[in-house]
């Protein structure tokens, strides 16, 4: 009985280890950046939709963080498709010009969002349209290039 349990536990551990992504790999690095982008975007959107209290300074800081993050993940997409565990469709590598075009669009709209936050005090209503453009840029890339 003990021997059988040991075999099952070792097999489970081996399978779990196979599913982990090396955090230093290109896949691991871009996943971490995208997760940080998602969390930051959700906080900003939450402030504009009333899920979180609106704090102009915090929103402005989050916009700068999101803009910085928006420039980072693209360097972690290698020229050739990487291994399993990626949510990226093969089209990322097959249509790189379009992929990079959408990346530049995201960088542009996050930069615009930062620009709007420079005029204090911030008005949540005035931030809705620029934030909507950021979310639309994210969605456009996900629709074309991400497996859901």
Regions found by a protein language model. Name each.
Residues 14-17:
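C-terminal motif of bacterial Sec signal peptides marking the signal peptidase cleavage site
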Residues 9-12:
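Alpha-helical transmembrane segments
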